[in-house]
C-alpha cells in the first residue's frame, strides 16, 4: 500500500510527527497525519464502505449487482470481495471488542445491519472469508472465485426494488459523510489528507479527486440534499449533523 497513516497521540510533539513524516517520504510512501481515535481515518471510513455493501445484501439486493455497481463507480473491488479478503472474522472481532468497550463505559453499541449480517455469516453460517476457505465467495482450487450460491437463497428477495444509482451513491456518499465527520471531530485536520488518504488508503475512486473533493464536486448544497434523501431511505449513516456541515464549509479550499 502506498499510504502510511501517521497517528498523533495526545502527547505527540511536532518534532516527532515531522520525523515520522520525513521517514515515510524516505521510504517512498505517501504520509498523512491523523489524530488518535477509534479506527483512525482509513479503517473507520473503509468500514463504512464494506458494511454498506453488506447492508444492501441484507436488504435483498443481489450480490452480483452490488459488486458490479461498485466497480462501475470506480472502486477497485466490490465491498463483499474486500470483506472476504480482509476476513469477515476480523470484522466480527472488531464488533465484539467495540461492544465490550461500550459496555465498559456503561453504554450499548448499536450494530449496523451490515455488521449484523457479517456476524451471522461468521457465527451462524461459518463463512469467515477467503483465508478460511470461503465467505461471500467460493474459491475453487485452480479456478476463479465465484459468489457463494447460497447468498441467493439466504438473502435475495424477489421483487425487491433497487437501482444502480442508489447503490453507487450509497457506497460513495457513505464514505464521504464519514470523512466529513472525521474532519468535524478533529481526526482529520485537512482536506488534503482526507483526499489523499481516501484514494490511496481505501480505494476511493480517483476520478472524484478524493472523498472531500467528491463533496465539493457535487456542490455542497446538492451533496447535503442527496444525503438527506439517502438518510430518509437508508438510515442515519448518511445523516450530516451541524458540525459535519460546518466542517465541509470551513475546510473548503479556495482556488
Put a short name on every predicted segment.
Residues 1-255:
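N-terminal glycine-rich phosphate-binding loop for ADP-containing cofactors
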Amino acid at each position: 500500500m502506498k499510504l502510511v497513516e501517521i497517528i498523533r497521540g495526545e502527547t505527540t510533539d511536532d518534532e516527532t510527527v515531522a520525523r515520522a513524516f520525513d521517514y515515510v517520504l524516505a521510504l517512498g510512501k505517501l504520509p498523512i497525519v491523523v489524530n488518535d481515535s477509534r479506527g483512525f481515518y482509513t479503517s473507520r471510513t473503509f468500514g463504512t464502505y464494506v458494511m454498506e455493501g453488506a447492508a444492501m445484501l441484507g436488504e435483498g439486493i443481489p450480490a452480483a449487482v452490488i459488486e458490479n455497481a461498485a466497480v462501475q463507480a470506480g472502486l477497485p473491488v466490490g465491498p463483499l470481495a474486500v470483506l472476504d479478503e480482509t476476513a469477515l472474522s476480523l470484522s466480527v472481532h472488531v464488533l465484539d471488542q467495540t461492544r465490550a468497550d461500550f459496555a465498559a463505559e456503561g453504554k450499548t453499541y448499536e450494530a449496523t445491519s451490515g455488521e449484523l449480517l457479517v456476524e451471522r455469516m461468521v457465527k451462524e453460517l461459518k463463512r469467515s472469508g477467503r483465508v478460511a476457505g470461503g465467505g461471500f465467495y467460493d474459491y475453487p482450487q485452480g479456478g476463479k472465485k465465484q459468489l457463494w450460491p447460497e447468498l441467493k437463497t439466504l438473502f435475495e428477495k424477489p421483487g425487491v426494488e433497487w437501482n444502480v444509482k442508489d447503490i453507487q451513491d450509497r457506497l460513495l456518499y457513505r464514505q464521504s459523510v464519514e470523512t466529513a465527520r472525521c474532519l468535524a471531530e478533529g481526526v482529520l485536520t485537512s482536506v488534503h489528507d482526507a483526499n489523499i488518504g481516501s484514494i490511496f488508503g481505501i480505494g476511493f475512486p480517483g476520478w472524484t479527486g478524493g472523498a472531500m473533493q467528491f463533496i465539493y464536486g457535487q456542490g455542497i448544497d446538492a451533496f447535503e440534499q442527496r444525503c438527506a434523501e439517502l438518510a430518509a431511505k437508508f438510515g442515519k449513516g448518511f445523516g450530516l449533523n451541524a458540525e459535519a456541515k460546518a466542517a465541509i464549509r470551513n475546510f473548503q479550499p479556495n482556488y
